[in-house]
């Protein structure tokens, strides 16, 4: 018996793509903008809810498409108010999104891949391997479907996966998020974090004005290569060259993320080389405490050591902050996102 083909998903399509859809189905072109309004403004879950579209056209659309919204399958609340959500995507894989409330903002950290190819030594996500890219709709579904969606002020692409290894779908999701016919967000409320993926970074810098955060973690090539295999494919020097050539003269910002490990990248020599590398780039350096993960021979630096390293960078003229860990008790902090179900190859319970 031939399996029924899976319907295509409307969520994540741009206005141009929706126009192509309705044209191919023989509907008026203005129907595309109506559909966009239902998807991204009214945020419906079913095509039949799109009541300003004729019933005949809704039925025709439903033959080939579905909206593609799905609710999280579980959530966990941290003592500090951070909430971690677990989503199942169409491939059957699991991804997480983390809601981080603060006094003056409400941030959602979203995922772009099931697992990750980068396999950074200090990150749990890479330990489960790479299971696939999320579609633009699956990325946007995280934003639309968390309980706190109406409160959100900021989005960070810092969840599971390397966003620029899935550049086409990530950039499509940003396009929908920032368009007037989409979610209408300012690009200045969106930050993307990357280890450095050449073609993806070129596109991100050229096609958006969103903020950029670079996972740096060691200023020396060999030291960074030990921590991050991506250094072999795109050395930090190349990433910095592209940033220097990009336009950061307006409100767009670039920051550098630096997890500090005891005895690995915490010396005065590391601070001096980091300061030398970043000279001439208006930026912020975010120092991040390491969260111990099983089987990884890295140790977190003491709070006193973090302050010392921060002082060295500040003395060299850099705005430097130490990130406050959030959601550590529910494995939602930096480097801790993963799913035991995927790492174990398909157990029924997803946890950390």
What are these regions (language model features)?
Residues 134, 196, 325-326:
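Short beta->alpha linker loops
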Residues 137, 141-149:
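Ferredoxin-type iron-sulfur electron-transfer modules in oxidoreductases and energy-metabolism complexes
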Residues 101-138:
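Canonical Radical SAM [4Fe-4S] cluster-binding loop centered on the CxxxCxxC motif
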Residues 83, 95, 106-110, 118, ...:
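Generic beta-strand structural signal
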Residues 1-95, 101-103, 244-253, 258-352:
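Auxiliary Fe-S-binding modules of radical SAM enzymes
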Residues 99-100, 169:
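Residue-level structural signal for beta-strand termini and adjacent loop
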Residues 147-154, 159-321:
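Conserved AdoMet/S-adenosylmethionine-binding subsite of the radical SAM
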Residues 130-132, 143, 156:
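Hydrophobic alpha-helical bundles in membrane proteins
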């Amino acid at each position: 018996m031939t399996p029924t083909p899976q319907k295509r998903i409307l969520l994540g399509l741009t206005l141009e793509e929706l126009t192509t859809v309705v044209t191919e189905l023989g509907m008026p072109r203005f129907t595309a903008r109506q559909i966009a309004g239902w998807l991204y403004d009214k945020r419906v879950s079913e095509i039949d809810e799109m009541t300003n579209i004729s019933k005949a056209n809704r039925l025709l659309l439903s033959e080939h498409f579905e909206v593609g919204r799905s609710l999280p399958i579980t959530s966990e609340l941290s003592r500090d108010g951070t909430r971690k959500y677990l989503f199942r995507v169409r491939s059957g894989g699991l991804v997480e999104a983390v809601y981080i409330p603060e006094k003056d903002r409400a941030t959602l950290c979203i995922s772009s891949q099931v697992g990750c190819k980068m396999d950074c030594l200090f990150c749990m996500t890479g330990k489960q391997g790479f299971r696939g890219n999320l579609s633009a709709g699956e990325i946007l579904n995280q934003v639309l479907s968390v309980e706190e969606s109406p409160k959100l002020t900021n989005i960070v692409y810092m969840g599971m996966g390397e966003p620029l290894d899935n550049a086409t779908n990530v950039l499509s999701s940003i396009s929908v998020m920032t368009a007037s016919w989409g979610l209408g967000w300012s690009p200045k409320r969106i930050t993307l974090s990357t280890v450095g993926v050449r073609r993806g970074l070129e596109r991100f810098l050229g096609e958006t004005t969103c903020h950029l955060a670079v996972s740096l973690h060691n200023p020396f090539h060999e030291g960074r290569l030990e921590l991050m295999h991506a250094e072999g494919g795109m050395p930090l020097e190349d990433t910095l060259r592209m940033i220097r050539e990009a336009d950061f003269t307006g409100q767009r910002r670039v920051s550098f993320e630096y997890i500090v490990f005891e005895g690995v990248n915490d010396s005065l020599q590391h601070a001096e080389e980091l300061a030398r590398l970043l000279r001439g780039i208006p930026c912020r350096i975010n120092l991040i405490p390491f969260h111990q993960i099983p089987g990884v021979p890295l140790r977190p630096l003491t709070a006193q050591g973090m302050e010392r390293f921060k002082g060295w960078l500040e003395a060299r003229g850099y705005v430097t902050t130490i990130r406050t860990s959030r959601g550590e008790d529910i494995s939602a902090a930096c480097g801790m996102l993963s799913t035991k179900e995927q790492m174990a190859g398909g157990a029924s319970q997803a946890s950390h």
